[in-house]
């Protein structure tokens, strides 16, 4: 599901850039920025800027000042503090894993929720907001089910990517027939061995 969501997000970013507008892409924690950065850099190159608190103050000031000019990044990927960066023409705000409590700034002041701040920021620019999650927060669920937010559910694989095969296993029945020797079914163990055993050319 996450891979589908990432592909959907990438398409929305491309669409926004074609309109000549900027994108703010928020992640709940710095640890996630590395893997997302690698993927986005391959597609968007130098149009992508990274911003978070692990950067030295001088580097963050440089990014801030660059965003005030025509040479500012088209895409900013960052954590909650990125909502305070200046933008010329913001067109899309993405809050990935919007349910995460790390979007809340508790200490030091100012105390704020980056997801909520991002929604307000988007409205100030007339930009779209995309909240991504497999497990919506109570507030987002309420807003989506009452029609305040639009709701897109990925029930099928995005762009016809093949679904994995799901095989139900009756554990109770296996216990009854005394075919369970541990925590895992014989079928699961069989597949584990199949995919972890070295191939003949690796031996």
Language model segments and positions:
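Conserved interdomain linker/interface between the two RecA-like ATPase lobes of SF2 helicase motors
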Residues: 148-197
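Conserved Walker A/P-loop ATP-binding site and its immediately adjacent core
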Residues: 22-38
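Conserved motor-coupling elements within RecA-like helicase/translocase cores
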Residues: 57-76
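Conserved helicase motor
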Residues: 30, 50-61, 79-82
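Post-DEXD/H (motif II) to motif III coupling segment of the RecA-like Helicase ATP-binding lobe
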Residues: 104-161
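Conserved helix-turn-beta segment of the N-terminal RecA-like "Helicase ATP-binding" lobe
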Residues: 35-56
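Walker A/P-loop NTP-binding motif
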Residues: 10-19
């Amino acid at each position: 599901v996450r891979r589908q969501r990432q592909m959907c997000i990438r398409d929305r970013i491309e669409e926004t850039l074609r309109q000549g507008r900027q994108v703010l892409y928020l992640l709940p924690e710095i640890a996630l920025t590395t893997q997302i950065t690698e993927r986005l850099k391959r597609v968007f190159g130098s149009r992508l800027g990274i911003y978070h608190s692990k950067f030295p103050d001088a580097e963050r000031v440089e990014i801030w000042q660059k965003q005030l000019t025509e040479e500012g990044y088209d895409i900013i990927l960052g954590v909650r503090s990125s909502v305070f960066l200046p933008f010329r023409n913001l067109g899309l705000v993405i809050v990935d894993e919007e349910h995460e409590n790390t979007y809340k700034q508790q200490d030091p002041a100012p105390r704020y929720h980056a997801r909520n701040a991002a929604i307000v920021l988007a409205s100030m620019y007339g930009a779209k907001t995309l909240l991504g999650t497999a497990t919506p927060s109570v507030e987002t669920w309420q807003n989506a089910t009452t029609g305040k937010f639009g709701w897109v559910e990925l029930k099928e694989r995005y762009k016809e990517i093949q679904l994995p095969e799901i095989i139900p296993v009756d554990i109770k029945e296996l216990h009854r027939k005394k075919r369970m020797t541990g925590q895992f079914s014989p079928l699961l163990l069989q597949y584990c061995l199949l995919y972890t055993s070295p191939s003949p050319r690796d031996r």
